[in-house]
Amino acid sequence: MTPEHLPTEQYEAQLAEKVARLQSMMAPFSGLVPEVFRSPVSHYRMRAEFRLWHDGDNLYHIMFDQQTKSRIRVDTFPAASQLINTLMKAMIAGVRDNHALRHKLFQIDYLTTLSNQAVVSLLYHKKLDEEWREAATALRDALRAQGLNVHLIGRATKTKIELDQDYIDERLPVAGKEIIYRQVENSFTQPNAAMNIQMLEWALEVTKDSKGDLLELYCGNGNFSLALARNFNRVLATEIAKPSVAAAQYNIAANHIDNVQIIRMAAEEFTQAMNGVREFNRLQGIDLKRYQCETIFVDPPRSGLDSETEKMVQAYPRILYISCNPETLCKNLETLSQTHTVSRLALFDQFPYTHHMECGVLLTAR
């Protein structure tokens, strides 16, 4: 695979290899055959980052080969959304002959939605001044005149210039309901929107007969919290990143959801609060004992759950675990399987044509 070519004819084979690999990894914990959720074979990535290469008067996007570290010119990127591909051409055309925009520009980041909105961030090794702002405003207006719903941001050391806003609002159809998600530039969002919809619908389906409340760790912008709220009396969710918490609070209001509470704290801190080890000012006014959480949802970073959080989640009758790294999932299952059994297993092909796998398990208490 190269940045400008996807081996779409190999999609079925690469997916079958992942299914077999996941089933083998999970064999010590479950004999289940994974439920498989396929990705679109192209234009599935909603965000992308490129370095810029200045070659005389020429200017183009580049990526680096992971093995050789050699430079690869990228004029089209079929893994990315159609909107990103359109913007790549438009940005090069708009920046190439404009000194204020081109000088010391070293990277462009693209974030798009299925609702055809975009934030484009231009990263510089220089101070950004009023001349840059005027040139960027003119470029933004020219892009909008082409029918592109785009917002531009300039970034440099200790500097961030938003021409109007640093976010876009995604609208996802999830099990018959549209959910609005505010996505903030430079914050985590699910890269494969079509796969995200399938993950949300799977999580809804496996929790459809739930009782009591839901506790979620690592909630981000409320991606799962908002979708799962309809299956539970109340949802209590934690997140450490301020921009993600702010986006989650906006999303709760925008979707008119009244049973989700977001707390800004790390999963490890919440574990300490639940165990009575420490008290936190951020929990003032929140009576944790009022929540009857029978299900806990975790979507941890690649490192998986730490040992204290492992112990904490074992106290819940049901554990819904979305993993971006099956190796750390299996490491966690060495502990979790002592008290719980795997009752559902899913593979989400979040990153086609790579070795990466995203998977989900539902664990029920023995």
Swiss-Prot record:
GO biological process, one term: tRNA methylation
Matches recorded under PROSITE patterns: SAM_MT_RNA_M5U (PS51687), TRMA_1 (PS01230), TRMA_2 (PS01231)
GO CC entries: cytosol
Bilayer-crossing regions: none
Entry superkingdom: Bacteria
Entry EC no(s): 2.1.1.-, 2.1.1.35
Keywords: Methyltransferase, S-adenosyl-L-methionine, Transferase, tRNA processing
InterPro entries: MeTrfase_TrmA_AS (IPR030390), MeTrfase_TrmA_CS (IPR030391), SAM-dependent_MTases_sf (IPR029063), TrmA_MeTrfase (IPR011869), U5_MeTrfase_fam (IPR010280)
Enzymatic reactions: uridine(54) in tRNA + S-adenosyl-L-methionine = 5-methyluridine(54) in tRNA + S-adenosyl-L-homocysteine + H(+); uridine(341) in tmRNA + S-adenosyl-L-methionine = 5-methyluridine(341) in tmRNA + S-adenosyl-L-homocysteine + H(+)
UniProt-annotated catalytic positions: 324, 358
Binding locations of S-adenosyl-L-methionine: 190, 218, 223, 239, 299
A Pfam family assignment: tRNA_U5-meth_tr
SS bond partners: none
Gene Ontology MF terms: rRNA binding; tRNA (uracil(54)-C5)-methyltransferase activity, S-adenosyl methionine-dependent; tRNA binding
Keyword Repeat included in the entry's annotation: no
Family: Belongs to the class I-like SAM-binding methyltransferase superfamily. RNA M5U methyltransferase family. TrmA subfamily.
Function description: Dual-specificity methyltransferase that catalyzes the formation of 5-methyluridine at position 54 (m5U54) in all tRNAs, and that of position 341 (m5U341) in tmRNA (transfer-mRNA).
Protein name: tRNA/tmRNA (uracil-C(5))-methyltransferase
Source species taxonomy: Bacteria, Pseudomonadati, Pseudomonadota, Gammaproteobacteria, Enterobacterales
